[in-house]
Regions:
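Catalytic loop of short-chain dehydrogenase/reductase
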Residues: 90-113, 118-127, 139
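A conserved structural motif in NAD(P)-dependent oxidoreductases
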Residues: 153-164, 175
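Substrate-binding pocket helix/loop in short-chain dehydrogenase/reductase
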Residues: 50-52, 58-63, 149
């Protein structure tokens, strides 16, 4: 709520995997502002564990936490953006989209699905001036992470949350009007994929 006040925005508490909460978020925002020009989707970390020891329920929970909110929110926001003549959506996922990690198996599996969905969505709705991109952060200082993970970056440090935020703001803005369907890594060189 404090951040919402600072940004002249709104705060709405809910869970991305709860369709009633996402419906209410969009309704609440439209009632307050009358339009939605951009949407940033960032969900928490799904269950982790050894690959074959993760329960079926945890795999389902990961799907509900990571992929389904993107699909649900897209269905809700697209008609609004169509009526407004366009908009921009950014999905925050992870660097492990390009290089899956056994440290984050469910995240690796379902977040690559978000990148695939993003490409399909941009193919379908790009002609209507609705853009969708993914931001793929590396290890960021807002998380409680072991220091040795910072050494994976060529900069030998964690990303600052402000560095991720500036990239997201760019992708949401008209400054990136010709960028859509992309999965953009902001990982400090952690991934080796070209």
């Amino acid at each position: 709520e404090k951040l919402a006040d600072e940004l002249n925005g709104i705060a709405y508490r809910g869970r991305a995997e709860n369709s009633r909460d996402t419906d209410n978020l969009i309704k609440f925002t439209m009632e307050k502002f009358g339009r939605i020009d951009s949407l940033l989707i960032h969900v928490g970390g799904p269950p982790k564990g050894d690959l074959l020891e993760i329960s079926e329920d945890d795999w389902k929970k990961a799907n509900e936490m990571v992929l389904m909110p993107v699909i649900r929110l897209s269905k809700l926001i697209t008609p609004i953006m169509q009526s407004q003549g366009g908009g921009s959506i950014v999905n925050i996922t992870t660097f492990s989209v390009f290089e899956p990690s056994l440290m984050f198996p469910t995240s690796s599996v379902y977040r690559v699905g978000v990148s695939s969905y993003t490409k399909l969505y941009s193919d379908r709705y790009g002609p209507e001036n609705i853009r969708m991109n993914c931001l793929l952060p590396g290890f960021t200082d807002s998380l409680d992470l072991p220091e040795e993970l910072s050494q994976m970056s060529v900069f030998k440090r964690f990303a600052r949350v402000e560095e991720q935020a500036k990239t997201a703001a760019f992708l949401l803005s008209n400054d990136s009007s010709y960028i859509t369907g992309q999965s953009i890594r902001v990982d400090g060189g952690v991934t080796r994929h070209i």
